[in-house]
């Protein structure tokens, strides 16, 4: 049974996604349906966590919009994501960056690494 589940989910996995980690800044292009129209909405922010594995893997992106922190969690392998761009790679020592929620302004900056 487990083997069958793995085979089915393997077909659903996306291979066109870039490698990214917590601390990286991403630009996520999301397909949004409004009435009978479909458009692309861009959400840019810092990855604060990645969790799960396989088809159920998710990642959370945080940005500050008009002074308010906004976090959005995306399933990694969803067809709703048109594309993901890595804007910059950040150097962090944690897998979950929940501490960024408490920091404001320059304190919330993440050191950039060149790859």
Swiss-Prot record:
Keywords: Ribonucleoprotein, Ribosomal protein. This protein is located at the 30S-50S ribosomal subunit interface and may play a role in the structure and function of the aminoacyl-tRNA binding site. GO terms for cellular component: cytosolic large ribosomal subunit. Belongs to the bacterial ribosomal protein bL19 family. It comes from Bacillus licheniformis (strain ATCC 14580 / DSM 13 / JCM 2505 / CCUG 7422 / NBRC 12200 / NCIMB 9375 / NCTC 10341 / NRRL NRS-1264 / Gibson 46). GO terms for biological process: translation. PROSITE patterns: RIBOSOMAL_L19 (PS01015). This is Large ribosomal subunit protein bL19. InterPro entries: Ribosomal_bL19 (IPR001857), Ribosomal_bL19_CS (IPR018257), Ribosomal_bL19_sf (IPR038657), Translation_prot_SH3-like_sf (IPR008991). One of its GO terms (molecular function) is structural constituent of ribosome.
């Amino acid at each position: 049974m487990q083997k069958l589940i793995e085979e089915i989910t393997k077909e659903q996995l996306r291979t066109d996604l870039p490698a990214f980690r917590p601390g990286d800044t991403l630009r996520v292009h999301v397909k949004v349906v409004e009435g009978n129209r479909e458009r692309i909405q861009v959400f840019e922010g810092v990855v604060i966590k990645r969790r799960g594995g396989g088809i159920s893997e998710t990642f959370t992106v945080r940005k500050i919009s008009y002074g308010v922190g906004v976090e959005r969690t995306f399933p990694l392998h969803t067809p709703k994501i048109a594309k993901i761009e890595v804007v910059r790679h950040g150097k962090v020592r944690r897998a979950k960056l929940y501490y960024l929620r408490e920091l404001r302004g320059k304190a919330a900056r993440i050191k950039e690494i060149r790859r």
